[in-house]
């Protein structure tokens, strides 16, 4: 029996495009596929794209988020709400996070634009975003940390062990997409009029072009749907769930990451700093990024250089995601 061909587009038409807004047309689609494709893409666009946001702030003279600052109109809670709205675009590809100290005085208003001269790896996309209003006599000093992430992450999940006293962790809105709308219209192919046209409108914060955002969302869906291909469908799921299996490379990596740092040729100073921070194994060490290490008590650049050499020689990197090695399962 002959297999009926699906009507599907051979390309996506970009109707309008700027750095912030894009309108795209996708046609023809079989009846019902407008909703299927449109809803899936919209969900991924709004929840699963990477972006950059402030994850923590430390303000001089402030112990907690319910404090007030003399000479500043807004309380700390309001300042944090305003910091959450600041949008960033990465300027240097190698940088995923940055901690910066911001000092402002002689101003009646602190805006996100004041941050730019203190930040090297990121561009502030909404410099007019007001952070707080202040007396000109006030000198305001704060340290913010910018990190890469996906979607929305609550402050509780941003918390880090051994953070400096007075660090306030912030809800992070990483998603670079501000709004997504789609509509479905009838489309005619020859004599048939019940095919569909999918029209997509994407508004971004400027850190990613709408066209690139649509491409990334589609790739994410493709990677997930590939799991349903014939070679990935198996009857061994129950057995795998009962007995964890690892390939040779993963087993080697697990053993390496569980290596005690006291067994490494490290200086006494570096070992003492790490021990005080409860960093005992290579896995503990590489789970931190360099900025986090520099916040350890008595930890200096000489110790960082020593650890960078160790980590590099072992073929590892700082800030690694170790979840796939399941180090907590022995």
From Swiss-Prot:
Transferase as a keyword? yes
The record's annotation in InterPro entries points to: DNA-dir_RNA_pol_insert, DNA-dir_RNA_pol_RpoA/D/Rpb3, DNA-dir_RpoA, RBP11-like, RNAP_asu_C, RNApol_insert_sf
What are the GO BP annotations of this UniProt entry?
A: DNA-templated transcription
The record's SUPFAM superfamilies line, in alphabetical order, gives: C-terminal domain of RNA polymerase alpha subunit, Insert subdomain of RNA polymerase alpha subunit, RBP11-like subunits of RNA polymerase
Is Transcription set as a keyword in this record?
yes
A GO molecular-function descriptor: DNA binding
**Annotated spans, Alpha N-terminal domain (alpha-NTD):** 1-232
Report the EC code(s) recorded for this entry.
Answer: 2.7.7.6
Q: Which reaction does it catalyse?
A: RNA(n) + a ribonucleoside 5'-triphosphate = RNA(n+1) + diphosphate
Q: Which residues form the signal peptide?
A: none
What are the GO cellular component annotations? cytoplasm; DNA-directed RNA polymerase complex
Region of interest (Alpha C-terminal domain (alpha-CTD)), residue spans: 248-330
Query: What UniProt keywords apply to this chain's record, in alphabetical order?
Result: DNA-directed RNA polymerase, Nucleotidyltransferase, Transcription, Transferase
How it assembles, according to the record, is: Homodimer. The RNAP catalytic core consists of 2 alpha, 1 beta, 1 beta' and 1 omega subunit. When a sigma factor is associated with the core the holoenzyme is formed, which can initiate transcription.
**What does this protein's UniProt record list under function?**
DNA-dependent RNA polymerase catalyzes the transcription of DNA into RNA using the four ribonucleoside triphosphates as substrates.
Tell me the HAMAP family matching this sequence: RNApol_bact_RpoA
What is the designated name of this protein?
Answer: DNA-directed RNA polymerase subunit alpha
Originating organism:
Christiangramia forsetii (strain DSM 17595 / CGMCC 1.15422 / KT0803) (Gramella forsetii)
